Amino acid sequence: MEEPRVHNLEKLMDEGVAGIEQLQILTAFKTHVKKELVRDDSIERYFDALVRFLGQPVEDRKVQQLGHSSLCYLIKRVAMQQPGRFQGARIRDLVRVVLLQEQLQERKVWGSAVKSLEAIYLCKPQAFEAELASICAATRGSDRTKCLLFMDELIQLQQMNNRNPMEVVNRFVDLWVDVLNESDPGCSKRDIELIHDILKKYFNEAMLQQFAERVVNTRSLKHFMHTEHAAPSSAQTTSSMPSGPFDVDEELTRVMEELPPNVVNSNIGEARDYLSFEHVVKDLEHITVAFQAIKETEHNWKQRQEGIITLRKIVNGNVSRQFPDEFIQACRDLNIADCISKAALSLRTTLSSHSCHLIKEMAFKLGPLLEPLLDVLFVPLRSLLSATKKISSQTAFATAAILLCTAPYHNRLFQQCIALSRDKNVSPRTFAAVFLRIYIIRFHRRLEHSSVLVEEWLHKGLTDPQTQVREAMRVTLWYWYVPNAQSAKKVLDSMPHQMKRIIEGSIPTYLNIEYHVTASVSSNESSRRSSFGVRRYPSYAAPTQSSNLQKLAANSLGGSANVRSLSENTNRHLTTYTSLAKKSLATRHESLSPRVASSGLISSAGAANLSSENLELTEELTSNHSNTLLKKYLNTNEPAVIRKSEGEPTGDLESMYSHLSSTTLQEKQQGLLFLKNLLLLKAPLDIAKLNPLLVQLSIQSPKSFKDLLTLASFHPLIPLANLIELFAINDLPTNVLLDEFSSTDLLETVIHSFQTFFPDHHDQLFLYYVKYRSVIFNYCFGIMIDLLSGDFAFSEGSTLFREVCTRIIEACGNDFNMEKYYTLISILYRADKSQFVELLRDAPVSSKFKIANELQRCDSTFNLHSIMSRESTAESHHSDPNQQYKDGAHGGDARDANGTSNSSSDSDNEPDLESTKHLLEMTMVNPIGLGCVENVLQSHIHAYKQDQQHQDPIAEKSLSTVAEVNDEDGDGSTTTQMKLMGANTTEPSNESDKDKTSDIVAESMRGTDDPNYAKLCAIDSALIDSEDEPELNNFGGLKGLTEMTKVVSIYEKLDGDEDVEMVDDEKFKDPVEQENQETGLDEIFRDEKHDQSVKFNDIPRIIDVNKSWDRYDGESIEDTSGNTSHGTDENRPASFGTVSELVRKEMEKSPTLPLNEEDSKLLSDGINEIELKHKDDPFVRDSEDCENGTPQDRSNFLSCKQHIDILGALPDNSLTAFELGLLEILDVSDMDANRILETVNTIQNSRLRSADVSRIVGAIVSHCTDPLLHWLTDSNGLQRLWSMLTALSTADGFSDSYKCVVLYTALLIANSQLSSSHLSTDELSDAWAFALRELSKLSSYNNETYIACCELRETLIEHYSSSYLPQLLESAIKELNVAEDRVRITFLLQTLSDALDHMNTLLSLEVLGSMSSLLQQFVTNDFTEWRYHSIKLLAQIYGILVARNSPASYIRSMFSILRQPEFDLVKSYYTMDHN
């Protein structure tokens, strides 16, 4: 065992020690005392050091508070460790230092001081009372007041422990008499009133008069002369109990009268007495024999009934009087309570009734001694309250009420009664109202600490749909009104007006409650009618004098009632019942306000200051003590409190800053409550100092700001971007921001904040935005929609519209509400269509098409092709051809004069040759078409033809050069062909042929005076200049773009110069290819090669398996040209490994373009739709023949290459394989493609059933034929089946969740075995979310649903690791932050472990650190499985760090939350698992 540390507290008194060092010493000592034992030989030294330190003045108030708190913890630790240390002198010093500190705010430290001194009192009660009495007699002023208040605390402690409080009161009575009889200047007026108020709580009037006879001081005696106000005016009863507002016996008797008399008065006539308790034990053992069987049968129920009757006789005998403790212990040892529970739940009414009567008689006879058996005995009664037999429910109700009337307060019993108020049956809810009434009568002081639960209970009963429940709860509400009027009024104020009037009319007369009903405004004098002025009547219908008098009398009564209600409203809380239900920290403290209106303990002077006290929120928040005398007498004379009452919060600023600067979240949240108090008081605040503290806390705990966000004065304290995020997370309306801030500021803040939503993994905001990013996105879209849908308009010349559109388009594809997003897109599009379309052209391809498709749905006039090219559609399609001719004709002259081209038409459309960042996008849509020479040539030829339509046909025929742009390849690439139409020449294929083309054009025009000759010269010049452009290739395109889109046919011979990089070290070159260096694309597009079908017998040389490796057998193989090859080619690779290595290198050289999910699906669908023509290929024919016998049964080539084997992908011992095997047994022979299509249509037009989906999946599992496979892939059958399963799982009342998980797993495996995925990540997320929802309903791991969910997770990770695993990891982390269910958290921890095994090398150190911080909180949890999986995960993270050669100090810092033994356990687990 580690030796306890020794702290040098004497250093605190050194002059050279600064305040920061003192804080460090005290913090370390306090942490040590709270968690560990202290050394026995250091206890006295610690006490002496802290007493001396707190006895001297300390400048730093925070240091003094920390020292006081450390001493309180030390006292409690010593009281537990060595209670004998407290002696007379030590007790005296500790009381003076802990209780009588004048420089501290007593209300803040009073609770800790009381708890520590109570620990001393429990150790040495007599010595403590003696020292406290001596200190009280010797002190004056505020110190004596504190001593008197602490005496009242000791009396309450005695009462809370179910002991007689009068014992402690009587021990202090003599001291109080001496204090009251002191001569002037002796006891102050405040101390006299305090002693009087203490005595009023425990003495009745007769006892007070007897006490007053001992008081001889006239100044003190006058406070005891008039005692009519001894009890509260709202609870004047003929009570004989001095300790509360109720006469408990009388009220409980009234409750008993409401119970069924046959149950209350029923009693067994016989009683059995015993001389020795050993005989009792023998009889009890004999009784338990009949209850050893699990079930009740025809043979043992009579024996059980006889045993219960015997128990009743034993209880009614002398055992409960002579051997009560021994009897209770024997019942616990022999499980008698379980026997009684079994008998009570019997279906035989007589046996159940005898058991209930037995519980009732045990409650009467044993009373508080029955506490160890309360839980077990109340459970069967709770079940019987919902019984259909009325006699059973009535008997159980009476028994439970009697049990609550006699048993002591038990928190678990109280919680079970609260659960009854939520029962689905009417009877338990009605009985719960009576049970709450019993608790109020007996334990109203205890319920003050649980006022929020009581208010919720009352509210639920008062608004119950059943009349009998509401009627019972109305009476209970007025019982709660007697001890806690403010809380009851709060519940009343939350009721609708009509319901409130009914409740006010049901006040029990025997409670003598003085409650004035608030007069409501008459309907004849409503606010709407009064706005029209004085009502005017015609002369024949004017009201009479008598009606006017009645109206005036009613108004006078209503006025007096309104005066009363206004005074009561000053004490009413600002929060409503709905906000109380959320149980936030601020509301919890607000609900603990003193019961000033009903207690009657405040004098007239105190009542005058009542409103100011209730507005002082700091006092309510810092001290939640229930003693009302504290709020009346503690620190009422201190200047700080006087200044607070005047509205000058002097100490709250320091408290707020110190709390907000704390390292613990709870203290920071208390700092927010201080801030709210200061904002209500309009105190000046330092915004520069508060801003960083609030921003940091808004990231750490954003939901703590909900109450502050409703205050407009809080909004300037935090940046607008953070304020918007807080509004989004707390789900507050947007109109507050729209009304307070300008539209421009909101728009600029929102669009600039989009950039911060995606921080790096090492940023501390990473997990924050992972959790709240989608919520903030949706809220920002809502702000912009509300803003732009109103009167806001973008100013002309402003760049704001461009910035907004750019940011919104860039946000496409993220995780948010797409409906809101597209609504905002349509609003922006309508604002400026032309500019929005221009900006949309610059967007990425995937985002561009998504937005364009949505705009096309919303606006039928939207042209989808307008975003396909960078060119301006107005200029390129609607310009005048003659104007084009003029520009082209003068282009050559301008070029000759200036040396440069000044053509406006070319300069506008010329691409930016220096910027190639969009080249990758251009490969999809060819946006630089106008930059190609062929397009220039085509435009000039077109203009020439327009002018020559009616001229010489010979000249027209001679000009037959046409440029065709052929884009029919289907793969997005552009192939340019130059043809001479009408001329008997061959198409050019080299450099000399290009010259021939220009010569032919020139020759056809030479010797003529045709003015169009200049046009052709311009064309010829354009061709020549285009060849000289350094950045344009031979085909008129950009060289960079051409290199990116280079297409090399596998049937084309390689070009030795330009394609030398396609081979590796000349391994694939042969002499024939080296001779043909000038092979262009024209060789591919000869007339005889225009057949669009693929010749599968022409196997390419690079991938020719027959010529490369194991398929080669040395025989002659005929190639495509009919030649034969004998032996082995010397250029052929020698082995399979060499060729596979070369192929791998070629694959690495190929550029891989990241495609999103939608583009991948479009590409996959396009490939699947290609019809491939078959030729006589022995390989294809053999594969077809062996499967179907004839090749005509295949619909396309890709289908024959696909195969689904779901059971083969599952382990043999998996639960999913077992369930799918049962589906395979079903008769699904008739489930062909047509039958499945009919079934799907029938399901969509009728009710969806799980059996139909199971039959379809069974057909896929058992025998997936080609038509069925074709339906799954080409007809989107898999997606339709998935949608049906999702609709089935989300249907109301669906109970076959286990089957849904199995079917989800089957479809996931089927999708993974297809050539392309037909399920999106959103659909995968639906299955994952469904599994998590079902796990939240489980209470144990021994469940088939849990095992099926585990196998679903394994399927996702195994088959979708590359596409879905990052999203799965993010979802698991997000769910782990909010999950509370035991089974669900275990499942998520296992998911993180499996995901970490697949992504360990892909995660950064920052992400690993964030996961480590999240997982370390589960290491010390009570649940074993949480501890195990968290240790396993931390060991995995530790192993990753070790594998990356991270320093040991860095690894330890990443596990800083763990203690050293826990960290050693992580390392041991890693070592064991690694070995």
UniProtKB/Swiss-Prot annotation:
GO terms for molecular function: microtubule binding. The keyword Cell cycle applies. It comes from the Eukaryota. Its main location: cytoplasm. The keyword Cell division applies. Microtubule binding protein that promotes the stabilization of dynamic microtubules. Required for mitotic spindle formation. This is Protein STU1. Residues 887-896 have a biased composition (Basic and acidic residues). One of its GO terms (biological process) is astral microtubule depolymerization. Interacts with microtubules. Residues 870-913, 1113-1134 are annotated as: Disordered. It comes from Eremothecium gossypii (strain ATCC 10895 / CBS 109.51 / FGSC 9923 / NRRL Y-1056). Belongs to the CLASP family. It holds the Pfam family CLASP_N. It is found in: Cytoplasm, Cytoskeleton; Nucleus; Cytoplasm, Cytoskeleton, Spindle. Keywords: Cell cycle, Cell division, Cytoplasm, Cytoskeleton, Microtubule, Mitosis, Nucleus. GO terms for cellular component: cytoplasmic microtubule; microtubule organizing center; mitotic spindle; mitotic spindle midzone; nucleus; spindle microtubule.
